[in-house]
């Protein structure tokens, strides 16, 4: 009888532990970026697939809402054949509607190097103290807008001279963070790039 009593108590303790575990583990916590909105700007053609999709995945995994903008709305094809739907045009996109703005690279991003609308969005984002990010060749958009002067920044190697001529300290690193400006050097760095944007938004 005594053994049966001890066995019954042990079962109750085990069951009690199982029912309490989810609460102790914080399973009901909201993602860290719940309520945050991020704008991803892609070229009108030939954006770099990983730089959009991997970065976007990291942001959404953390709970952020994302939107894609380009020169025109509609379906756009990347360099590797992936497609993305731009729901906003550059002319209608406003930095004030988002917590961060990300310029995606790829060969097509060069069309924004001296684009006044792209530069206006970049300048507004920085002026409003929000997170501003660019990857691959896209950091040249920020450099040409005068936003990298005196800043540590990286980019695809072809852009190193332009960044330096615009006053940036070119690091050559995969990802570089300087305050709220985040830059990365190419598709292999896209996941880390996304993670750094997540950190900056927390």
Where are these regions (language model features)?
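Positively charged n-region of N-terminal signal peptides that target proteins for export
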Residues: 1-4
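Sec-dependent N-terminal signal peptides
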Residues: 6-13
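C-terminal motif of bacterial Sec signal peptides marking the signal peptidase cleavage site
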Residues: 15-17
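Extended, subdomain-level signal for the structured scaffold at the beginning of enzyme domains
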Residues: 19-128, 141-145, 162-172, 176-202
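Short, thiol/selenol-centered motifs that function as redox-active sites or metal-ligating centers
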Residues: 135-138
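Short hydrophobic/aromatic-enriched beta-strand-loop microsegments
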Residues: 148-157, 170-173
């Amino acid at each position: 009888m005594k053994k049966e009593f001890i066995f019954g108590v042990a079962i109750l303790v085990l069951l009690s532990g199982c029912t309490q575990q989810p609460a102790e583990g914080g399973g009901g916590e909201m993602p860290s970026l719940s309520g945050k909105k991020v704008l991803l700007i892609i070229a009108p053609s030939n954006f770099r697939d990983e730089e959009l999709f991997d970065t976007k995945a990291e942001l959404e995994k953390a709970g952020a809402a994302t939107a894609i903008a380009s020169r025109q709305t509609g379906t756009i094809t990347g360099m590797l054949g992936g497609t993305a739907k731009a729901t906003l045009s550059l002319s209608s996109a406003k930095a004030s509607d988002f917590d961060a703005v990300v310029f995606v690279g790829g060969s097509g991003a060069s069309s924004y190097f001296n684009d006044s609308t792209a530069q206006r969005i970049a300048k507004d984002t920085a002026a409003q103290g929000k997170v501003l990010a660019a990857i691959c060749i896209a950091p040249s958009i920020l450099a040409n807008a005068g936003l990298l002067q005196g800043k540590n920044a990286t980019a695809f190697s072809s852009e190193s001279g332009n960044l330096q001529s615009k006053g940036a300290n070119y690091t050559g690193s995969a990802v570089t963070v300087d305050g709220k400006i985040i830059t990365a050097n190419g598709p292999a760095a896209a996941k880390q790039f996304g993670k750094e944007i997540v950190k900056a938004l927390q």
